Curated annotation (Swiss-Prot):
Protein's name in the database: Aliphatic sulfonates import ATP-binding protein SsuB
Localization annotation: Cell inner membrane
Function (record text): Part of the ABC transporter complex SsuABC involved in aliphatic sulfonates import. Responsible for energy coupling to the transport system.
Residue ranges annotated for the ABC transporter domain, each copy included: 17-238
Reaction catalysis annotation: ATP + H2O + aliphatic sulfonate-[sulfonate-binding protein]Side 1 = ADP + phosphate + aliphatic sulfonateSide 2 + [sulfonate-binding protein]Side 1
Membrane topology designation: Peripheral membrane protein
Organism: Pseudomonas entomophila (strain L48)
């Protein structure tokens, strides 16, 4: 398997992120309440929490799919909005166009001689031989690999992952986790992964952030060597620490997070 060709150093560096007093309200409901985050360039961060806690709203704000009610988002010293061209977002649904072949889905929106780059991206995710097939012929995991290739072709500096592995079976999910981790280590982009799976979070991330009732409840550094040994005592201890914090929060589960209409400048992994 080959890897994507060397790119200029600017494109290999992740984007440093900062959220300062970030707030988002929907009517009378405050979904995010003064979130403060500082994420170094190239860090792999997992965001976990109960359904409705605000984690998906946070990712939508980072992706530019929604606007904050207060506070600011920065990429280094500049507004995060200035880094949109270097940002890609993956969803649980691969969102492939069924009337376009795999390689055309990867090169969606590109012009010029993009096909060699698309083949390189597909090769990086192990699907070069499926380039000229239709999406309907692929499994769920393979479709997500295509979505990942569609992001990689743009050499993102920030990759936002909104439960991209949630619908996959256990073995395929682990394979995708390993693939994303390998590509992250290779290219050095910043990653934010929203997941309900605490074991997934501690297995792949440098840092696990727990969102509780719209605020940061726990910010845990996962200081373990890579590749990590699944089922190890140290990994299990970290998973238990996060789970115990989640389960210790009193009260009934919150309502589902509101979803604002998608803006016209939406950028998926394409």
């Amino acid at each position: 398997m080959t890897v994507l060709k060397e790119q200029p150093p600017r494109l290999l560096r992740g984007i440093p992120l900062a959220a300062n007093d970030l707030r988002r309200t929907f009517g009378q409901r405050e979904v995010l309440r003064g979130v403060d985050l500082h994420i170094p360039a190239g860090q792999f961060v997992a965001i976990v929490g109960r359904s409705g806690c605000g984690k998906s709203t946070l990712l939508r704000l980072l992706a530019g799919l929604d606007q904050p009610s207060g506070g600011e988002l920065l990429a280094g010293a500049a507004p995060l909005a200035e880094a949109r061209e270097d940002t890609r977002l993956m969803f649980q649904d691969a969102r492939l166009l069924p009337w376009k072949k795999v390689i055309d889905n990867v090169g969606l929106g590109l012009s010029g001689n993009w096909r060699p780059r698309a083949l390189e991206a597909l090769d990086a995710v192990g699907l070069a031989e499926r380039a000229h097939e239709w999406p309907a012929a692929l499994s769920g995991g393979q479709k997500q690999r295509v979505a990942l290739a569609r992001a990689l072709i743009h050499q993102p500096r920030l990759l936002l992952l909104d439960e991209p592995l949630g619908a996959l079976d256990a073995l395929t999910r682990i394979e995708m986790q390993q693939l994303i981790e390998r590509l992250w280590r290779q290219h050095g982009f910043t990653v934010l992964l929203v997941t309900h799976d605490v074991s997934e979070a501690v297995a792949v991330a440098d840092r696990v952030i727990l969102i509780e009732d719209g605020a940061v409840g726990l910010d845990l550094v996962v200081d373990l060597p890579r590749p990590r040994v699944r089922g190890s005592h140290r990994l299990a201890a970290l998973e238990s620490e996060v789970l115990n914090r989640v389960l210790s929060v009193p009260g009934t589960p919150p309502e589902p997070e509101p979803v604002a209409p998608l803006p016209t400048h939406l950028r998926w992994a394409h």
